Amino acid sequence: MTTLLSPQRERWLLFTLAGIQFTSVLDFMIMMPLGPQLTQLFGISAGEFGLLVSAYTFSAGLSGLLATTYIDRFGRKRMMLTLYPLFGVAALACSLAPSYGWLILARVASGFFGGVLMAISQTIVAEVVPFDRRGRAMSVVMTSFSVATVAGVPLALFLVSHFNWHAPFMAIAGMVGLLVVVALKTLPSLKGHLQAHAAGDATLSFLANLRLVLIDPNHLKAFAMSVCMVFAGFAVVPYIALYLQANAGFKTEEIPYVYLYGGICTLISARFIGLWSDRAGKALVFRRLALLMPLPLLAMTLSAGLPQWAILAISSVLFVVMSGRMIPGMALIGASADPRRRGSFMTLNSAVQSLSMGLAAWIGGQILGRDDAGNLTLYWAAALIGGGASLLSFVLASKLRLHGEARTT
């Protein structure tokens, strides 16, 4: 049931949700370019840094699974205003971390409280904005990803270079505090979904529905494709900053350009890839990009010694292809779900993707080593594994059975 708001209040709601997602995405993304500073400060290996990245995603994945048991038993505003401030506290804990162990625990907390914010935001949009305007409304919220890449990460790294690595997390915690105050005014009280079921009944219902989702062979193929699609990029991407500083001679203040140029190219290319997918077919476009993905992955890991402009070009192509696959890929995965269980399927898929990100980052970190000169070694091996995952997603995409109108695209 849709709860209609005035145009002005709806606009403020969407801006608030976009701001919430911006802080959540930035909190996750900023950890990757901080690799050089954190490995040096705490005296940790690339593998231990990979655990810092994967701690967030593993926690977010588990949080997503748990959320399916309770998210519909509370009002949307209450859920958001409980989890989001706790996410801000976790960001503050990251900024105050005096040791590697403290930071690991803070990242686990950030993932746990931040991992379900997007699901809550999407649910609020679905319950407030009529279907005929929902796509445009969701695009406002989803711009947080691009803005975090193009503006958020470079600005956060600017704070790092002029202050220290604690500064971005302090800034995120401050933004969360401001947005909580705004959300108190802009979020509607949505309680129409609440039902007077006993907790045990709700849990049993969830488990029964979960079983129905997991026994469908087509769903399992879609989950496998989703794992491979996400794994391909996250075996390599978390270590780009480490590699560029250790092997390619990038300075700390030059790393933001990787994310700035990559984000701009992604913003421009996303629209064209979306149009291409609609016209040529999602499966065709996804398979072509999945086949292409191993090339920029391997090129990125072997780029040391190239001119800086060439390295930035390679990283930008990698960002474009990696994010571009997600446009037709997620459409295929969504269309493969049994329409009667699509909500549960998509919630599980989100958790599966988070767990896959964590696994890929951890495996990539275990592969990497350092030589006597301090250069990263075997980065190319992580790219080969990521490329293999991308090729496997190509195979799995052709085996999905799509539902409804998606069969013709």
Give the label of every model feature segment.
Residues 161-173, 366-388:
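A membrane-interface helix-boundary motif in multi-pass transporters
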Residues 32, 219-260:
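Extracytoplasmic gate region of multi-pass secondary transporters
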Residues 2-7, 189-223:
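Juxtamembrane intracellular "pre-TM" segments in multi-pass secondary transporters
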Residues 140-187:
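Helix-loop-helix hairpin linking two adjacent transmembrane segments in secondary transporters
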Residues 62-101:
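Conserved MFS/SLC helix-loop-helix module at the cytosolic interface between two early adjacent transmembrane helices
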Residues 106-147:
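Cytoplasmic helix-loop-helix junction between adjacent transmembrane helices
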Residues 283-329:
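C-terminal transmembrane helical hairpin of 12-TM major facilitator-type secondary transporters
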Residues 43, 75, 96-102, 249, ...:
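Helix-breaking motifs and short loop linkers at transmembrane-helix boundaries and internal kinks
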